[in-house]
Amino acid sequence: MSESIQVIDSVHSQEIPIVDGIGNAKVVVWPGTGARHRTFQVINLGENSKTVQLCHPESDAAYYVLKGQGSVFDIGTGQSHDLGEGGMVHIDAKDRYQFVASASGMDLLGGPCPADISLYAGLKT
């Protein structure tokens, strides 16, 4: 794909199976859309839902809380950090983490950078 500006419809984006409970995770910007240096997933966590445990061996990750409240759990240290609308979180490469929504649910935008190709196994390009 040539370098260009793209407008990507997240509504019709493919899903990746990283949500445990109510919700979904849609891949919006990833190597399958031509992105080489960045990824974005829209993660919708319903009431008291969570992601599976995540870890990116060669990628940092950053997320922005679009809506709702919850926490990010650092599996390595056992610490939980509260998150709310407008909050951001940065996770170093190799750190294991999990997002947990409160009763209000939580929507996030973000992902690993550079891409963690293992997240996209089985997706159509």
Regions found by a protein language model. Name each.
Residues 1-39, 52-53, 119-125:
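A short, N-terminal "cap"/entry segment at the start of jelly-roll beta-barrel domains
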Residues 37-38, 64, 71, 83, ...:
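General detector of folded, globular domains
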Residues 44:
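Short proline/glycine- and basic residue-enriched helix-capping loop/turn segments at helix->loop/beta transitions
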Residues 50, 56-85:
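A short beta-strand-loop-beta hairpin characteristic of the jelly-roll/cupin
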Residues 84-85, 93-119:
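Ligand-binding loop in jelly-roll beta-barrel domains
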